[in-house]
């Protein structure tokens, strides 16, 4: 019933993907060999969304693991939950994409893409009523960004009416692997704007700041960053995995969250923020969770929501708590900060509550915001892109794989358009429309005279 097929591409995608499966397997009572060892019917009620029940009563993730080199997938396979995945669903090349978007999208990735699509088809045939796909990848490398976006457009071609949802890790100068990240990211965003329905922007810079400032980790590792990502992914998929009424599938979430088709880049947040291994022992209250969740420091994208306005917001509270208190707190925060919510979409904040908290916490809350402040993130990438592109630095790596400079120019202008669209709706007020009609009437009256 209402299945989601999960695809993870590239090193980053496979690492956060593997972590995601560890976390949700734990929440659903699935052990590393796929047996159910849980104690609650709620864990099994919607298990088929992410897992396929095999003949031996084992639960197998509907996951497809893709990379252009074998390294990361070997470590996933030998990791704690490596035997959970279907062995045929590991698809990898040997050559690697060398952090080059063109290799992932046009050359190396294009050679591997058909064998990936075969596995995608097989997974979809196993579904009763597929609701859509989710992809975990990064935008800074070669495989996740180049081949990831290639997969999106191919899957989109074949399943045009299914929802396409991505968890996209956006590069940042603070945690940088390669100098060409701005190129790869811009080329990817160019694709995501057109071909996805929902994109959660997870930003290394924000994750790094959270580890550094809030969790007081002196030297955050990728493991620490991934811990935050998996908590957030577990949170935003809660309403898809456990019984509930609100945003219970990807399409309903999209309908609530996306007022204009291009503006589907969400800013996720999570509360309470905890370190790996030291989950908090103090019980949090609903007001504290609500405060924290709307705090700029808790956002997983390095943008300050106070610099923009929320078009729409969805929140998920987890744990045993009073619905009434949750509703009161959410109303309070909206009326106190009403200037940060656009007034031309009434009731633009939706709240879901799920009884099952994540492991180690009594309560938690997850935040999904569609804020115009996300333009800060695109501006940041755009500035870095322009600085290099003006001098045509590193371009030969891309043109050598058959790309044209035009494609860079198009991607750049598409991203700049996206920024201006966010700005336009940030400045829009509810009155403007009415004033425009009055002017028209006056003109037509004068015309009638």
UniProtKB/Swiss-Prot annotation:
The modification 5-glutamyl polyglutamate is found at residue 438. Residues 421-449 are annotated as: Disordered. Some glutamate residues at the C-terminus are polyglycylated, resulting in polyglycine chains on the gamma-carboxyl group. Glycylation is mainly limited to tubulin incorporated into axonemes (cilia and flagella) whereas glutamylation is prevalent in neuronal cells, centrioles, axonemes, and the mitotic spindle. Both modifications can coexist on the same protein on adjacent residues, and lowering polyglycylation levels increases polyglutamylation, and reciprocally. The precise function of polyglycylation is still unclear. Some glutamate residues at the C-terminus are polyglutamylated, resulting in polyglutamate chains on the gamma-carboxyl group. Polyglutamylation plays a key role in microtubule severing by spastin (SPAST). SPAST preferentially recognizes and acts on microtubules decorated with short polyglutamate tails: severing activity by SPAST increases as the number of glutamates per tubulin rises from one to eight, but decreases beyond this glutamylation threshold. It is found in: Cytoplasm, Cytoskeleton. GO terms for cellular component: cytoplasm; microtubule. One of its GO terms (biological process) is axon guidance. Its cofactor is Mg(2+). The keyword Cytoplasm applies. Residues 429-449 have a biased composition (Acidic residues). Neuron specific. Mg(2+) binds at residue 69. A motif (MREI motif) lies at residues 1-4. GO terms for molecular function: GTP binding; GTPase activity; metal ion binding; structural constituent of cytoskeleton. Dimer of alpha and beta chains. A typical microtubule is a hollow water-filled tube with an outer diameter of 25 nm and an inner diameter of 15 nM. Alpha-beta heterodimers associate head-to-tail to form protofilaments running lengthwise along the microtubule wall with the beta-tubulin subunit facing the microtubule plus end conferring a structural polarity. Microtubules usually have 13 protofilaments but different protofilament numbers can be found in some organisms and specialized cells. The MREI motif is common among all beta-tubulin isoforms and may be critical for tubulin autoregulation. This is Tubulin beta-4 chain. The lineage of its organism: Eukaryota, Metazoa, Chordata, Craniata, Vertebrata.
């Amino acid at each position: 019933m209402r299945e989601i097929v999960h695809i993870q591409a590239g090193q980053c995608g496979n690492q956060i993907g593997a972590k995601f499966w560890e976390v949700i397997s734990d929440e659903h009572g699935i052990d590393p060999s796929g047996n159910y060892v849980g104690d609650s019917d709620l864990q099994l009620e919607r298990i088929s969304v992410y897992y396929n029940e095999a003949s031996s009563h084992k639960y197998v993730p509907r996951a497809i693991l893709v990379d252009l080199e074998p390294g990361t997938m070997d470590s996933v396979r030998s990791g704690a939950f490596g035997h959970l995945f279907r062995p045929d669903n590991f698809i990898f090349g040997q050559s690697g994409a060398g952090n080059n978007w063109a290799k992932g999208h046009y050359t190396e990735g294009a050679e591997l893409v058909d064998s990936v699509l075969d596995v995608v088809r097989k997974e979809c045939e196993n579904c009763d009523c597929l609701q859509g796909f989710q992809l975990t990848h990064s935008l800074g490398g070669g495989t996740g960004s180049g081949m990831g976006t290639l997969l999106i457009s191919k899957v989109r071609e074949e399943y045009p009416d299914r929802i396409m949802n991505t968890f996209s890790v956006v590069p940042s100068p603070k945690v940088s692997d390669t100098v060409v990240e701005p190129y790869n990211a811009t080329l990817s965003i160019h694709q995501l704007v057109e071909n996805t329905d929902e994109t959660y922007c997870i930003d290394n810079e924000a994750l790094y700041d959270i580890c550094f400032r809030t969790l007081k980790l002196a030297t955050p590792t990728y493991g620490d960053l991934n811990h935050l990502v998996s908590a957030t992914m577990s949170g935003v998929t809660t309403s898809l995995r456990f019984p509930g009424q609100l945003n219970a599938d990807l399409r309903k979430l999209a309908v609530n969250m996306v007022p204009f088709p291009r503006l589907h880049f969400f800013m996720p947040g999570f509360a309470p923020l905890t370190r790996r291994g030291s989950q908090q022992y103090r019980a949090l209250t609903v007001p504290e969770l609500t405060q924290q969740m709307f705090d700029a420091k808790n956002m997983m994208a390095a943008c300050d929501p106070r610099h923009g306005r929320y078009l729409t917001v969805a929140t998920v509270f987890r744990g045993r708590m009073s619905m009434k208190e949750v509703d009161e707190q959410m109303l309070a925060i909206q009326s106190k900060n009403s200037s940060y919510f656009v007034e031309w979409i009434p009731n633009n904040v939706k709240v879901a509550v799920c009884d099952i908290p994540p492991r180690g916490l009594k309560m938690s809350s997850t935040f999904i915001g569609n804020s115009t402040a996300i333009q800060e993130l695109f501006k940041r990438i755009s500035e870095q892109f322009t600085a290099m592109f003006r001098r045509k630095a590193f371009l030969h790596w891309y043109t050598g794989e058959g790309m044209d400079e035009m494609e860079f120019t198009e991607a750049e202008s598409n991203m700049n358009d996206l920024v201006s669209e966010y700005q336009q709706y940030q400045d829009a007020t509810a009155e403007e429309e009415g004033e425009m009609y009055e002017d028209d009437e006056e003109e037509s009256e004068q015309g009638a005279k």
